[in-house]
From Swiss-Prot:
It comes from the Eukaryota. Neuron specific. One of its GO terms (biological process) is neuropeptide signaling pathway. Keywords: Amidation, Neuropeptide, Secreted. Coiled coil: none annotated. The lineage of its organism: Eukaryota, Metazoa, Cnidaria, Anthozoa, Hexacorallia. This is Antho-KAamide. The modification 3-phenyllactic acid is found at F1. Inhibits spontaneous contractions in several muscle groups. May be involved in the expansion phase of feeding behavior in sea anemones. One of its GO terms (cellular component) is extracellular region. It is found in: Secreted. Its main location: secreted.
């Protein structure tokens, strides 16, 4: 999971 990641938020750019």
């Amino acid at each position: 999971f990641f938020k750019a």
